[in-house]
Amino acid sequence: MRDLQQLLDELKDMSFFNPGEMCIIGCSTSEVIGKRIGSVGSMDVAKEIYENLKQLEIDTGVTFAFQGCEHINRAVTIERANFNPLTMEEVTVVPDVHAGGSLSTYAYQQMEDPIVVEHITVSKGIDIGQTLIGMHIKHVCVPVRTSVKQIGEAIVTIATSRPKKIGGERAKYQ
């Protein structure tokens, strides 16, 4: 999947991935192969994407969280070691290709000790196929522009965040 590797290399060169940070991944493998979101799914595509992301975790120290589909309320699969009971609520569900999506299903199967949480707040994310990851990105969400606009047939959107600017016209920010 040349598009994916090109995107990840470009983001890596931009220092998008930082050690200890968590990045949310939303992915419609159906969209990647040119079908309507949620229609067919592909564990083969999920495996290829996951393995590329896993290598990036090793290379950069970033951690990935995997958003499920709307059938599980876009719940997020993470390693239990990253679970914070003060800011996250565990839910009882095991992602499945038809209720959770192929990538979150594959991630759940590959993780050492997976847990699914209802909601997470992270500073950045990659959305492959318009899966609507924005609900898991800190305010204020900011788009990141790259030369890669699609992974396969899926539109890709990258987001980061910045702190809110508060205080009105008299406030100073620098």
UniProtKB/Swiss-Prot annotation:
What's the superkingdom here? Bacteria
Give a Pfam family name: DUF436
Check the UniProt entry and state the signal peptide residues, or none.
none
The UniProt family comment states:
Belongs to the UPF0340 family.
* The protein, known as: UPF0340 protein SE_1711
Q: What is the lineage of its organism?
A: Bacteria, Bacillati, Bacillota, Bacilli, Bacillales
